[in-house]
């Protein structure tokens, strides 16, 4: 009986050890499935928001929006033949389309956001902000964008963050492209930037870069 109990104890110990190892392997496998990998699968599937893991991709952007206090957090991809692509030649002014939208009221899939200089800058690897603020329903926002990298080290999309800046823009309306006094800066800022405005540009760009790195393949 004692021998039987000892044998049973050994079997149970081995079974427990195997179970822990198996769980560990599953956790490691899940950790390997990062946001960037899922995004590549989304675009390659051609299924748009019917893609099985779309909700999980959006949920991650929702968390970012809630954590940092942005009005909108979303992802843009370059347009190719009317669809979002994983590659583009930025020597041309390629339009960008919205894909995963972490907003409370998301835009439709592949809405065309046109071309702006900061889209190209981010796609080429440099986090960049818009040259001016803009009017939102809840006040003024400043937008910034940063590259998200895939497994091969190439940019697969850009993360956009629209951050509220109404308090600052109230004192500098010329930095709001929707204001009658707008200074007209679109691609290059050729004048002096007030310290408070520069702080908004820098902080929004840093946010976009921080979260884009979190989404990138590790």
Feature annotation, model-predicted:
Residues 27-56, 182-185, 189-197, 207-211:
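Extracellular/periplasmic ligand-binding regions of membrane signal-transduction receptors
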Residues 19-22:
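C-terminal motif of bacterial Sec signal peptides marking the signal peptidase cleavage site
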Residues 161-178:
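Helix-start (N-cap) segments at beta->loop->alpha junctions
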Residues 62-84, 178-200, 214:
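Short N-terminal helix-loop-first-beta-strand/juxtamembrane motif that initiates sensory/input modules
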Residues 91-134:
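Extracytoplasmic/periplasmic sensor domains and loops in membrane signaling proteins
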Residues 138-147:
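A short beta-strand signature within small-molecule sensing/ligand-binding domains used
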Residues 1-8:
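Bacterial N-terminal signal peptides that target proteins for export
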């Amino acid at each position: 009986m004692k021998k039987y109990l000892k044998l049973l104890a050994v079997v149970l110990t081995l079974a427990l050890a195997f179970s822990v190892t198996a769980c560990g392997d599953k956790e490691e496998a899940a950790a390997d499935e990062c946001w960037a990998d899922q995004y590549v699968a989304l675009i390659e599937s051609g299924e748009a928001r019917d893609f099985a893991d779309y909700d999980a991709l959006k949920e991650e952007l929702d968390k970012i929006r809630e954590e940092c206090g942005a009005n909108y957090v979303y992802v843009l991809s370059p347009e190719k033949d009317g669809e979002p692509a994983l590659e583009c030649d930025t020597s041309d002014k390629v339009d960008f389309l919205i894909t995963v939208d972490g907003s409370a009221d998301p835009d439709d899939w592949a809405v065309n956001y046109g071309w702006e200089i900061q889209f190209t800058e981010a796609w080429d690897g440099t986090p960049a902000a818009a040259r001016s603020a803009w009017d939102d329903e809840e006040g003024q926002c400043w937008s910034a964008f940063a590259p998200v990298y895939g497994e091969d080290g190439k940019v697969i999309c850009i993360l956009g963050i629209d951050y509220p800046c109404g308090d600052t823009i109230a004192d500098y309306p010329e930095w709001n492209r929707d204001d009658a006094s707008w200074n007209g800066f679109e691609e290059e800022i050729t004048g002096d930037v007030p310290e408070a405005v520069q702080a908004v540009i820098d902080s929004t760009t840093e946010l976009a870069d921080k979260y884009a790195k979190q989404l990138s393949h590790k």
